Amino acid sequence: MAARQQQKGTGFGVQYEDFVPKSEWKDQPEATILNIDLTGFAKEQMKVTYVHSSKMIRVTGERPLANRKWSRFNEVFTVPQNCLVDKIHGSFKNNVLTITMPKETITKVAYLPETSRTEAAALEKAAKLEEKRLLEESRRKEKEEEEAKQMKKQLLEEKEALIRKLQEEAKAKEEAEMRKLQEEAKAKEEAAAKKLQEEIEAKEKLEERKLEERRLEERKLEDMNLAEEAKLKKIQERKSVDESGEKEKILKPEVVYTKSGHVATPKPESGSGLKSGFGGVGEVVKSAEEKLGNLVEKEKKMGKGIMEKIRRKEITSEEKKLMMNVGVAALVIFALGAYVSYTFCSSSSSSSSPSSSSSSTKPE
């Protein structure tokens, strides 16, 4: 047989080259001998097996080559019918595998007729054809098995690729959902923080406004108290001036001109009347002053209490009205005192004018 080489890959990075060894049959009277040329192979790299079901001998082997390549062969030979199966034996020498198949009956070729020789040749030819057919069938099955393996491997790779793709898509979807949840949570936190900051700022502004209003009320009350104290001081100064002027008028003697000369004699009647008049006005002013003093003291105490309430934000609308009423009452009392003082001064001026004119007349 002619040797041929064929490269096949398994997809795992190793390539196989199919090797077809040369074989030769020899028919001897005692046995049938099969010689197979296996140059390059060692005894440990080959295997010979007898298949009882098909009465065939299978010879297989493989050896490594360079660059991750392997050389292999798988040959099948038919065992002749006139053969003792249990006595088949082989030997490997000089790269040649020799398989000896002893015959059941020893034939003498020298005494065989020509027809027997022809029949033996025909049988040998038929055996070789059968051997060739079986070899081709074995190779075809081997090729189909290899293709099935390749198909199975391809399907497995496609399945793994699909699983990987689905896993990557699921992972990407999960990461997208996680990012979305994180962004939503961050937006909620920022909104809550912004709302809290706005509430704090609004509260601070409200507190500042209330504090400013309280300061304005305190300043207003202080201004009112200062104004009332200034008015009271002014009225007291005016009263002291009026009283000092009246005392001078009372103590000044009236000059009376007579024929013997002028003599300064007091007028008890008019003086007593004037004194009584001054005494009535003084009592009115004194009474008003006492009432005003009591009112001022009460107002000061009340003002202090109200100031404390204003600081504590406890002042009521009724207390505000009471404060206004106290201020109005004080103004009325001040006005009444001023009016009484003015009236008294006017009456004193009018009464002093006739007396002076009468005292200035001289007797003839």
From Swiss-Prot:
Belongs to the small heat shock protein (HSP20) family. The lineage of its organism: Eukaryota, Viridiplantae, Streptophyta, Embryophyta, Tracheophyta. This is Inactive protein RESTRICTED TEV MOVEMENT 2. The keyword Transmembrane applies. It comes from Arabidopsis thaliana (Mouse-ear cress). Residues 129-220 are annotated as: 6 X 5 AA repeats A of L-E-E-[SKR]-[ERK]. Residues 346-364 have a biased composition (Low complexity). GO terms for cellular component: plasma membrane. A- repeats lie at residues 129-133, 135-139, 156-160, 206-210, 211-215, 216-220.
